[in-house]
A protein has these predicted regions:
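Structured beta-strand/loop patches that form or line metal/cofactor-binding pockets in enzymes
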Residues: 1-9
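Active-site- and interface-proximal helix/loop "cap" or "latch" segments in soluble metabolic
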Residues: 4, 20-86
Length: 88
């Protein structure tokens, strides 16, 4: 196996286990303790042929920002799918 790297996500929770703060780092990508308000993560389990997901957002994220976040995420997913498969 070649070089390995780490991407880390730290989530601060309130007393009810609701996210209050999300911080992520990807040192090889030049990201160090960058704060974020939301994340949508999907991982493919090829053995079981299913998607594993983790969707998080901080409790004080405004709905208008959530709308923009989802719109941009869906557009990006569409572009990534087209680039990866050439399937329109």
């Amino acid at each position: 196996m070649g070089k390995q790297t780490n991407i880390s996500i730290e989530v601060a929770l309130d007393e009810n286990k609701i996210p209050e703060k999300i911080v992520w780092s990807a040192p090889d990508g030049g990201v160090n303790e960058q704060e974020a308000q939301a994340l949508l993560m999907s991982l493919w389990d090829g053995k079981n042929q299913e998607t594993l997901r983790m969707d998080l957002w901080v409790k004080d994220m405004p709905i208008d920002q959530m709308n923009v976040f989802f719109h941009q995420s869906l557009v990006t997913m569409s572009q990534t799918f087209l680039r990866a498969t050439k399937d329109e």
